Amino acid sequence: MKATRRCILAAPAVTLAAPVVTLPRRANALYDTATVNAAKNTYDVADATKCKAYLPLLDASGKTLDELAANWDRIATDGDNVRRYLGTVGVTSPLFKIRGGLKGVLKAKDLPDAFDVVAFAEASEAFLNDLQDAEGDAYGAQFADYSTSVGSGGQSPSATMLGKARKDVERARTSYAELLRLLAPLR
């Protein structure tokens, strides 16, 4: 007997149900639990009231920015690679915790009188804005080739966005140098 559309529509729902197949769930992250836990515990601050406790995180963040800038052509093959260094994709970059580190310095109970809290707060805000600009341009590079945007200088739209991100990273490095200068009384 040939099955017609009418026969199929008239059939009980039980016979139409597709077999249930349980597939293994895909991991939500690129990192296993041990890697995530190790990254979260990296640069943990033993005593949040001590301003010097944040210096290792801040120093490592500066080195990460320097590494990104020095190896840009190798790293910036796509926006997510840049964002991985900026701490917005994954948890392995020290910049992943930079907001908390900067805020922690400002909240520390043992800041020396020579430390300019207002200047540090303003420099922190400028740095975080530059970092956010770099992250936004790197994120946009992921999708720029699929949009109606046009690249400049004979480059693809994503290459243009990565070029903007590179300038943002350089601005962030300049802002960060100012932060490090302001941290001198803590050393």
Can you describe what each PLM-predicted range is?
Residues 21-29:
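Sec/Tat signal peptide C-region and signal peptidase I cleavage site
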Residues 5-6, 26, 99:
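Basic side chains
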Residues 30-187:
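Mature extracytoplasmic or organellar-lumen-exposed domains after removal of signal/transit peptides
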Residues 1-15:
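N-terminal secretory signal peptides and thylakoid transit peptides that target proteins
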Residues 17-19:
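Hydrophobic h-region of N-terminal signal peptides that target proteins for export
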